[in-house]
């Protein structure tokens, strides 16, 4: 429970939720602009490397500031090797397997459709958790999985014209959801620093390095033409770093410490709605009856699962930059 004396004002909660809804919902639109002229994995690697370094630098600077002023809080502890290993594995799963695959898929898939498919991650998370704990998934989880898969299946049906979606791109996005769910589960049980912000900074730093290494190894550097880079791509990348990885993430952490985790979890199904609306408004993405039906099935399944069952600490679905965080306590 959150102490009554620590309950924030309604405007503060609304502002933080609005930031998470709008910024994380708009990251899919930003990605669509980034991959127009920047290599997807290298761009993602730069994003998370810069964000991770910035977050760790902030934590170190804040720790020194507190020490100089004699503020009595637990100091920042340098991570152990086993914690860096966890950060590397989680970073690879979430940021290479998750975000990196989204970057690749959005070269052929509309940003709104990408967001809708990624919204199925909580469904996979629930199913994988049930398998690991050897507990039978609830009827709600099974129903949500079937309805969500039905929505994805509708997107894969053969079609033509505006109603056709690249099946390879759809498949890559499904792989991304599986990686996101796997990384979230591993982060929940693997050793990480007590400071959740430090753990996330480590994951971003490690994941960014993995993304850069893979991008170089598959020849993205050789295919990159600096002269072809557009202003829209650079602005999109800057938006992802500053707002997606830092501003919205800060609001997300604040919410986890001040409101119920079920309230924070609403972004899991609000974000795809925002992404679809922005894709239509700014990129002229077309909403056909088939894509609307698929989106309704997928988002409906996620709404039912997110709002209809107890949640473990930190389980709030896919975010662009974080695996799991505790919803209460002192997040350093």
Task: Please place each PLM-identified region on the residue numbering.
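Hydrophobic transmembrane alpha-helices of multi-pass small-molecule transport proteins
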Residues: 55, 120, 137-158, 169, ...
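Glycine-/small-residue-enriched transmembrane alpha-helix faces in small-molecule transporters
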Residues: 1-46, 58, 104, 162-189, ...
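Specific alpha-helical transmembrane segments that line the substrate/conduction pathway
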Residues: 42-53, 94, 99-136, 141-145, ...
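C-terminal-most transmembrane helix of multi-pass membrane proteins
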Residues: 1-6, 48, 63, 157-158, ...
């Amino acid at each position: 429970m959150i102490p009554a004396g620590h309950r924030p004002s309604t405007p503060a909660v609304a502002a933080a939720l609005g930031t998470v809804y709008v910024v994380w919902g708009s990251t899919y639109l930003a990605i669509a602009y980034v991959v127009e002229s920047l290599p997807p994995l290298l761009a993602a690697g730069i994003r998370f490397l810069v964000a991770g370094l910035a977050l760790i630098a902030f934590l170190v600077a804040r720790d020194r500031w507190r020490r100089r002023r004699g503020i009595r809080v637990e100091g920042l502890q340098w991570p152990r090797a086993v914690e860096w290993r966890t950060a590397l594995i989680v970073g690879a799963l979430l940021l290479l397997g998750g975000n990196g695959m989204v970057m690749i898929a959005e070269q052929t898939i509309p940003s709104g459709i990408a967001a809708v498919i990624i919204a199925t991650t909580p469904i996979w998370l629930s199913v994988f958790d049930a398998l690991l704990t050897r507990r039978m998934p609830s009827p709600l989880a099974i129903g949500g999985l079937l309805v969500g898969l039905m929505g994805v299946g509708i997107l894969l049906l053969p079609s033509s014209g505006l109603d056709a979606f690249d099946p390879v791109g759809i498949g890559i996005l499904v792989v991304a959801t599986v990686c996101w769910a796997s990384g979230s589960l591993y982060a929940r049980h693997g050793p990480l620093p007590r400071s959740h912000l430090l753990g996330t900074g480590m994951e971003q730093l490690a994941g960014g390095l993995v993304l850069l290494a893979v991008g170089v190894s598959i020849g993205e550097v050789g295919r990159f033409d600096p002269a072809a880079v557009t202003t829209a791509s650079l602005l999109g990348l800057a938006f992802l770093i500053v707002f997606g990885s830092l501003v919205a993430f800060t609001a997300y952490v604040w919410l986890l410490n001040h409101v119920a985790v079920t309230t924070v979890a609403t972004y899991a199904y609000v974000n795809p709605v925002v992404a679809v609306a922005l894709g239509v408004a700014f990129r002229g993405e077309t909403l056909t009856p088939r894509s609307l039906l698929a989106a309704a099935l997928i988002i409906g399944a996620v709404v039912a699962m997110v709002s209809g069952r107890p949640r473990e600490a930190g389980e709030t679905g896919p975010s662009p930059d974080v695996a799991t965080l505790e919803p209460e306590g002192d997040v350093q």
